[in-house]
C-alpha cells in the first residue's frame, strides 16, 4: 500500500538533499537543521498515529453489529479497507499486534449470517497470515483452523447455503494458514482437512473451487510427508487426483499431475511405496496420460506440464 504521507515525506527529504555536487566520501556527515529535524519527527509521529487510529477504527467497524443489510455492507467495507492496508507484511502484523484485529475477523466466520461478510473475512485472514509466521500463530490461537474448516463444509450460523466464493476463500485461507509450517499441516490433517479437500475434487464440482482445491493439495503434498502418507491411505482421493490429471481443464490437470508426482516420491518399503496409487488408477490411465502428453507437445507454453506428465509416466512404469 502506498502511503500518501510517506510519499510526501520522501519528496520533502529529497528536496532538502544537496545533489548538485559530489561530496567527499570522507567528509563528516551533514547535520540536519534542528527545525527541519523537528518537522520531520512531527510528521513521522503524526503518520504513525494516523495509521494506527485508522486501523483501530476499522477493527471497531469489523466488530460492529450487522443486524441489517446496511450494517453488513458497512462491515464488508471495513474488511475491504483492511485488506487494502494489509497488503504489506508490516501492516498485516500491525493489524493484530497493534489493533487486535485478527480475532474478531476470525469470529465472523462463525458468527456472521451474511455470506459476503464471511467471504471477505476469509480473504482478509488469508492475506494477513500468508508468509507471516507471527500472524499464523495468532490465527491458530484464535481458532481459525476449525472455523475455516466449518465454513468450507458449509456449517454456518444461519444454516443457509454457502456459496462457491465463500468456499474458495476458505480454502485459500486454510492454505495460507498451514503453508511452510509442519505443525500447522499436521493439525490440518488431524482435523480432517484432507477429507474436506477430497469432497471438492469430483469432476462435477464447481470448476474454480476444484482448481483451487487441487492447488492447495499440490502444495500440501509437496511440503508434508505426513500428507503424502495420508493421501496414499485414501483410494478415493487417489482416483480423483488421477481423473483430474487427465481432465480437459489444463489448470486442474497440471495441479493433479504435480500432486501425483509428489506422491510417487514416497520412499518404498516392504508394503509401502506407491502400490496404493497404482491400485487406485482408473482403467487405461497410462493411455489417457500419454494422450494428454501428445496434446501438451503441441503447446509451446506447456513445457513444464509436459515434463511433469512425463515424470509421472516414468515413475508409474518403474513401479
Regions found by a protein language model. Give the residues of each.
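Alpha-helical solenoid repeats of the armadillo/HEAT superfamily
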Residues: 2-39, 66-83, 113-129, 141, ...
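Alpha-solenoid helical-repeat scaffolds
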Residues: 39-137
Amino acid at each position: 500500500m502506498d502511503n500518501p504521507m510517506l510519499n510526501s515525506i520522501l519528496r520533502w527529504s529529497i528536496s532538502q538533499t544537496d545533489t548538485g555536487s559530489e561530496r567527499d566520501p570522507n567528509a563528516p556527515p551533514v547535520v540536519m537543521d534542528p527545525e527541519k529535524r523537528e518537522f520531520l519527527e512531527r510528521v513521522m509521529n503524526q503518520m504513525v498515529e494516523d495509521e494506527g487510529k485508522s486501523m483501530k477504527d476499522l477493527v471497531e467497524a469489523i466488530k460492529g453489529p450487522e443486524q441489517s443489510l446496511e450494517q453488513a455492507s458497512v462491515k464488508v467495507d471495513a474488511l475491504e479497507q483492511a485488506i487494502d492496508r494489509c497488503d504489506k507484511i508490516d501492516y498485516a502484523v500491525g493489524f493484530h499486534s497493534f489493533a487486535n484485529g485478527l480475532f474478531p475477523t476470525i469470529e465472523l466466520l462463525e458468527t456472521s449470517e451474511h455470506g459476503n461478510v464471511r467471504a471477505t473475512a476469509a480473504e482478509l485472514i488469508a492475506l494477513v497470515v500468508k508468509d507471516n509466521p507471527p500472524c499464523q500463530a495468532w490465527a491458530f490461537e484464535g481458532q481459525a483452523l476449525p472455523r475455516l474448516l466449518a465454513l468450507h463444509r458449509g456449517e454456518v450460523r444461519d444454516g443457509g447455503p454457502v456459496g462457491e466464493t465463500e468456499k474458495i476463500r476458505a480454502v485459500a485461507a486454510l492454505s495460507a494458514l498451514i503453508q511452510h509450517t509442519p505443525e500447522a499441516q499436521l493439525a490440518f490433517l488431524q482435523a480432517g482437512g484432507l477429507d474436506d479437500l477430497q469432497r471438492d475434487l469430483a469432476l462435477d464440482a464447481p470448476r474454480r473451487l476444484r482448481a483451487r482445491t487441487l492447488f492447495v493439495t499440490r502444495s500440501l503434498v509437496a511440503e508434508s510427508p505426513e500428507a503424502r502418507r495420508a493421501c496414499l491411505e485414501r483410494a478415493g482421493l487417489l482416483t480423483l487426483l488421477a481423473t483430474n490429471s487427465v481432465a480437459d481443464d489444463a489448470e486442474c490437470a497440471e495441479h493433479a499431475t504435480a500432486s501425483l508426482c509428489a506422491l510417487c516420491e514416497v520412499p518404498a518399503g516392504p508394503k509401502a511405496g506407491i502400490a496404493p496409487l497404482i491400485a487406485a488408477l482408473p482403467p487405461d490411465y497410462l493411455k489417457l496420460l500419454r494422450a494428454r502428453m501428445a496434446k501438451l507437445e503441441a503447446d509451446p507454453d506447456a513445457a513444464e506440464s509436459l515434463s511433469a506428465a512425463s515424470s509421472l509416466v516414468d515413475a508409474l512404469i518403474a513401479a
